[in-house]
Amino acid sequence: MSLPFTLPRRFPARRLMRVLAAGMAIALAGCGGSSTTTNILLSGNIVGLTDAGLTLSNGISSIVIGGGTTTFTFPNRTPLGAAYVVQPTTLPAAQVCTVTNGSGVAVKDVNTVLVTCVPSHMLGGTITGLSSGNLVMVNGGNVVSPVAGAQSFVFPGRVGQGFAYGVTVLNQPLQQNCTVINGVGTVGVSDINSIQVNCT
């Protein structure tokens, strides 16, 4: 069996090493190279998180964040070219968290995602004159349906400190008309319980 090529009789050893090194580099490139060129790290900063209970998702993997944490990095790399959306899937019991710079397409490592958390408060008030069912009130996507005879209400979802709220009647009770007083404002440092709903 003959060799694919024949070295000259005086082929310099140094030149031979260069040829072999080049061949090895080509072979390694053909095997795929480093995985870091096809996947990116997704990370960011957290401001104001004091309580446990925050979970973040990027559409590919999730990470549980402990109270007091100021940075995060998703453990699984995001495939190059894949779209990502960072958002909270669970929140601390007494905080709400919002995400800035949380979406995009993975073209390089991302470390600019910002998660901001603030205290959250209950939103509710009093009801007078409600004698029938089917009353539905909303605050954005937050919904509450007081039963006939109810004298107070609290929305199931808490509202973040500094966030605006606007309570409206989505559905009137049977044969009654309800109006909302003090239903618009901004959440301060305590729960809101001054909203009045009068039904006639």
Regions found by a protein language model. Give the residues of each.
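Bacterial N-terminal signal peptides that target proteins for export
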Residues: S2-L20
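Bacterial Sec-dependent N-terminal signal peptides
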Residues: S2-T6, G23-V47
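Short domain-boundary/entry signatures in modular proteins, especially
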Residues: G33-L41, V115-G124, T200
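A short, amphipathic beta-strand motif
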Residues: I40-G48, L123-I127, V167
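Short, ordered, surface-exposed loop/turn motifs in non-cytosolic proteins
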Residues: L49-S62, L130-N142
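Short, acidic Ser/Thr/Gly-rich low-complexity loop/linker segments typical of extracellular
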Residues: I60-T71, G141-S152
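Structured interaction patches on ligand/partner-binding surfaces of diverse proteins
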Residues: G66, Q87-P119, T168-T200
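Short Pro-Gly-centered beta-turn/loop motif in secreted/extracellular proteins
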Residues: T69-Q87, P92, S152-T168, P173
